[in-house]
Amino acid sequence: MGKPAAERRLSENEAQAFARLIRSSPRKLNLVAQLIRGKAAGEALALLTFSKRRVAGEVKKVLQSAIANAENNHQLDVDRLYVSHATVGRALVMKRFHARARGRGARVEKWFSNLTVVVRERADEPVQEAAE
């Protein structure tokens, strides 16, 4: 009994990972996501490791999860992976109150974001660098 398995939304040479409710605004998170779009997986991990932005650690965890999904669930070659999509979306916005002068209050919005990273296996063979 039970319902049939859903069809795979991605192609056979892709894997993805999600992060929900990242405590950063979508605008700031998208700056980090732009760094890794189209880059090889190893190069993207190196960029995120040495990035000064706080949210780069969260993006790195999602990218590592996507790489692990590709390797373990879809049997893709890790050396041929690259970041095909890195999309950022809005999540909830917490509204808070900040006390101001003369008994007034100001609204403080604390933005949350969602992140989706899709890695794809390149069709061509990885380039072997000449060893000296």
Curated annotation (Swiss-Prot):
GO biological process: translation
GO molecular function, one term: rRNA binding
Intrachain S-S bonds: none
Alphabetic keyword roster: Ribonucleoprotein, Ribosomal protein, RNA-binding, rRNA-binding
Gene Ontology CC terms: cytosolic large ribosomal subunit
Pfam (any one): Ribosomal_L22
Subunit structure: Part of the 50S ribosomal subunit.
Family, similarity comment: Belongs to the universal ribosomal protein uL22 family.
Function: This protein binds specifically to 23S rRNA; its binding is stimulated by other ribosomal proteins, e.g. L4, L17, and L20. It is important during the early stages of 50S assembly. It makes multiple contacts with different domains of the 23S rRNA in the assembled 50S subunit and ribosome. The globular domain of the protein is located near the polypeptide exit tunnel on the outside of the subunit, while an extended beta-hairpin is found that lines the wall of the exit tunnel in the center of the 70S ribosome.
NCBIfam families the record matches: rplV_bact (TIGR01044)
Official protein name in the record: Large ribosomal subunit protein uL22
Organism annotation: Rhodospirillum centenum (strain ATCC 51521 / SW)
Lineage: Bacteria, Pseudomonadati, Pseudomonadota, Alphaproteobacteria, Rhodospirillales
